[in-house]
Amino acid sequence: MLSAALLLPAPAKAVSADHAYVLDGVTGRVLFEKNAGERGLIASTTKIMTALVVCEQCNVLDRMRIPGEAVGIEGSSMYLKEGEVLTLQELLYGLMLSSGNDAAVALAIYCGGTVEGFAELMNDKARNLGLADTHFENPNGLDSPGHYSTARDLAKLAAYAMENPIFRKTVSTRSVTVGQRHLTNHNKLLWRLEGADGVKTGFTKAAGRILVSSASRMGRRVICVTMNDPDDWNDHCALLNRSFSDYQICPVVVKGQCVGTLEVLGGENSRVEVLAAEDFSYALTPEETVRIALPGPGFVYAPAVEGAEAGFAYALISGKAVGKIPIVFGETVEQKPEEEKSFWQKWLSGKNKET
């Protein structure tokens, strides 16, 4: 497992998007970025957070009666009718497949009491996930000056959300029937790209085309985000395919592997082995190698106890830290007992005290 944010994004290549970000979902390595930290409108990709909050805080088997406030909402819709009864899961399908703004309002009222109350839940979750450049004012993504995110934050949000099995099942569904409605997922990548399994489209005139996608191949997931991208389908296919072909997940160290030695000051032995406390893998190109380095000053004071925490080792590529691995002592090194003083050492010590 990776225990630190990973660096070294690939240089920006030609994409039509104003903002883009590609994230390896296993190791957290940034595979590509372009203006990824600039805030912008995010349209219906907002609904990733809406769905996540519902999945985490509500029982999706609950049934709700649709209130009048959730009917006739502007923009994309699943065409809810006042008084009809649907499960939250059915509303999630309407939210994430049909991009229903009405479904977003219905879910917000059920889970948050009010739209405003639900927006606070969304912002609480954003803070919890460390999405410092994200703020929500509504559950559907209708344009608002205080409603924004970045390509980087959207990728982090999507990577987290795809770990939730209910969310993952919902966004990977191509089509479903809800009552008399046949809902088809707006995400064309589910049909066009090998391994595509989510997550959300978005569009307003002010925001342009926004797309957050996920693809999984051989147990590895990659998240891709573009903002204001007129050629998003082709860009995502190219970025995701390139990510899978150019990078492979490579084991760097395994738990229990010796990663070096430290000097032991005042110990019965002069050095002690340190072991990786967990596995560490990283997304690498064929040309890259990872070097493991121990932090300075390179020594510890005795005693060193087998299995006790010894700090961290750092994984480096071309001298740059890309992650850190917790390490433990591989053996016990006791403190060296104080040597018995000779007669003359004791005599000299006594004379020094007298003076």
Q: Where does each model-flagged region fall?
A:
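Bacterial N-terminal signal peptides
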Residues: 1-5
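Active-site-adjacent loops and short helices of periplasmic peptidoglycan-processing enzymes
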Residues: 6-152, 156-165
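Domain-terminus/edge residues, biased toward the C-terminal soluble/receptor-binding domains
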Residues: 131-132, 143-355
